[in-house]
Amino acid sequence: MITELTDLKRNLELISSRLGQTQDYLDLPGLKAKVQDLEQCAAQPDFWDDTDQAQQILQTLNETKSQLEQWGIWQQQWQDSQAIVELLELEDDQALLTEAETTLEQLQKELDRWELQQLLSGPYDAKGATLTINAGAGGTDAQDWAEMLLRMYTRWSEKQGYKVHLAEISEGDEAGLKSVTLEIEGRYAYGYLKSEKGTHRLVRISPFNANGKRQTSFAGVEVMPLLGEEAISLDIPDKDLDISTSRAGGKGGQNVNKVETAVRIVHLPTGLAVRCTQERSQLQNKEKALAILKAKLLIVLEEQRAQAIAEIRGDMVEAAWGTQIRNYVFHPYQLVKDLRTNVETTDVGGVMDGELSDFIEAYLRHSARLDS
């Protein structure tokens, strides 16, 4: 108990220091003043005359209040743990010790997450994300791999508390998917998932090979911010768009749509293309596809570099040998390794079940070091 109590005190001191740094960074008096100003603004009689501006103000107000509330929770957790330590110095109590250890462990994780979010300072990092997976080299195995990645990113999103909506899906010839697009709604979804763009390589014994041979497959991942008014305000001349329609649905049977509701839009100057199939009408799919296309163009404009498109779009790089960002080896051994950060794990099952935090965090810290 003495050793455990000593460790608990040490953790308490470390977290106290981190909380002090966090308090300075947040500028609590400034946040409180900001809340008062925004509340006064929201109370004005003409507040709703400009609906868009009013919604932006309310969003900022809610986010600022959330920061203050989060700080209050952290402070209370630390104070509760401090009180338990004082009690433990007077009397041994294993249950209280366990409670304090659990509270501090959770507090450390929350501070880690908050500190990581401070690395997400890009103009669209706080937005939701549009994530597209395209099967690459590897035939049916690659299409199956694309479907496996769909599940992996869906599970990761659900664990973060994000909402996932299927925007487009194109089924494989025999199994799996040729392509799929997800809309992931939640704060910082784009900031986290932008680390996933690129080519993902799978090595395994192919379930589609009668001889049980080892197969290498590839899939490309593209990530864009999920934008609202920012994308709508971007004007694209009609002459720059090639819009085509087709039937949506699977390989056959009742799921095939007999009406041409699927929409594909190509931005002719850049070659950027978007396909949307999941809405009920052609008009809805067209609006959805155009919104995604505008988001892609905004990111390209934001980059303002000669090779902006190639760098910002994961599917612009051929999903094949030599282009991968991460290897997933299922056979002859089990290992997932990120080639950019060298972070690796043998817990292949956990990764495929959405345990991506170690890879994402390492990449964000790696990128921050490069930028600095």
Curated annotation (Swiss-Prot):
Tell me the superkingdom of the source. Bacteria
* Subcellular location, principal: cytoplasm
Q: What is this protein called?
A: Peptide chain release factor 2
The cysteines covalently paired via disulfide bonds are: none
| GO MF | translation release factor activity, codon specific
* UniProt KW Cytoplasm keyword: yes
Q: Species name for this entry?
A: Synechocystis sp. (strain ATCC 27184 / PCC 6803 / Kazusa)
Which UniProt keyword terms apply here?
Answer: Cytoplasm, Methylation, Protein biosynthesis
